[in-house]
Amino acid sequence: MQTSPLLTQLMEALRCLPGVGPKSAQRMAFTLLQRDRSGGMRLAQALTRAMSEIGHCADCRTFTEQEVCNICSNPRRQENGQICVVESPADIYAIEQTGQFSGRYFVLMGHLSPLDGIGPDDIGLDRLEQRLAEEKITEVILATNPTVEGEATANYIAELCAQYDVEASRIAHGVPVGGELEMVDGTTLSHSLAGRHKIRF
């Protein structure tokens, strides 16, 4: 029997986070109440502000508290002419950490999934098509996940790009650095062989 309804409510709320079960939620709640109440207050304030103030960029659909995010409003990024299509805002963070891309993004917030009733307009492809028609885009880099749905989504967007004479490319999928071939699955190995490149001296 719980001694505090508020404690129960806190633990239930924490369980909305991915990977957090009853035990983890209980541990988090007790830690905040026993050892870090000031941290808990900062978390509550940050969460409240984020939930009320963060929306979507009008151009790329990533998370931002501005109408247009810092990446899309950057003149150098605009001049680049490249758009990288990703499935989620988290993918932008991953790509930005590499320091290898200097263009802009478009976030689908998912992928095509006819069985789940998710069509082109549900993932913003009408907005992407509008950008292809109106902006000077030289290349669309398709960085959707290497899943069946991700590949289908990439192929659909590639066909869309062809209608506007915009080059479409797919990010390479292959053997991870430090990996051993015998441990790599067949699909990944097939992509690696198909995407091989010449060694020049």
Curated annotation (Swiss-Prot):
GO biological process, one term: recombinational repair
Sequence similarity: Belongs to the RecR family.
Gene3D superfamilies found in the cross-reference section: 3.40.1360.10, 6.10.250.240, RecR Domain 1
Start and end residues, zinc fingers (C4-type): 57-72
Name the UniProt record assigns to this protein: Recombination protein RecR
MF GO annotations: DNA binding; zinc ion binding
Xref: HAMAP family: RecR (MF_00017)
Keyword Metal-binding assigned: yes
Chain's role: May play a role in DNA repair. It seems to be involved in an RecBC-independent recombinational process of DNA repair. It may act with RecF and RecO.
Family annotation (PANTHER family): RECOMBINATION PROTEIN RECR
Organism of provenance: Escherichia coli (strain K12)
One Pfam family recorded for the sequence: RecR_C
Keywords (A to Z) from UniProt: DNA damage, DNA recombination, DNA repair, Metal-binding, Zinc, Zinc-finger
Domain Toprim span(s) in chain numbering: 81-176
